[in-house]
Amino acid sequence: LDYVYGPGRRAMNSPAVPALTKVLLEDVKKALTNTLSPGDRLLLVDMDEWGVDVALTGSQKALSFPTGMGLVCASPRVFFDWKDYLRTYWHYDQALDLELAVEAWGLSNRYNLSLGLGLNKVAGGKVFRDVGYPVK
């Protein structure tokens, strides 16, 4: 929620929002004002008290995060029913493997540090001599 401007503030002022939630969010805002940057948001959800069955969260752009960057919280009632849901679900987009993305980034950037230091300084030149690379 946007605590200061826009829909977050209007929602907090709405009579539909329980008074306890307003107090909780105001306390969180006061406690974290100096900790969070202007774009950071924190929302505490008591899933049991609010009757929430499934909650999704993700880094940066909410549901536009890459695979592996999301968190799904499920109540016990829903958690044990996943098998019925998974049989009828298919991903609408090509699934990405975050591990492969990180590995690809590492492979493309692995020599940047060593080349910046100079070939002679990396491992004392021993690694390069062992593979037949001329080292002075």
Curated annotation (Swiss-Prot):
Compartment annotation: Peroxisome
Induction (free text): By light.
Keyword terms, alphabetized: Aminotransferase, Peroxisome, Pyridoxal phosphate, Transferase
Record carries keyword DNA repair: no
KW DNA-binding (keyword) present: no
Regulation: Inhibited by aminooxyacetate.
Tissue expression from the record: Expressed in leaves but not in root tissue or seedlings.
The enzyme's E.C. designation: 2.6.1.45, 2.6.1.44
Main subcellular location of this protein, as a coarse class: other
One GO term describing the cellular component: peroxisome
Catalytic activity: glyoxylate + L-serine = 3-hydroxypyruvate + glycine; glyoxylate + L-alanine = glycine + pyruvate
GO molecular function, a single term: alanine-glyoxylate transaminase activity
Cofactors (names): pyridoxal 5'-phosphate
Family: Belongs to the class-V pyridoxal-phosphate-dependent aminotransferase family.
Quaternary organization: Homodimer.
Protein name, entry field: Serine--glyoxylate aminotransferase
Record organism: Zea mays
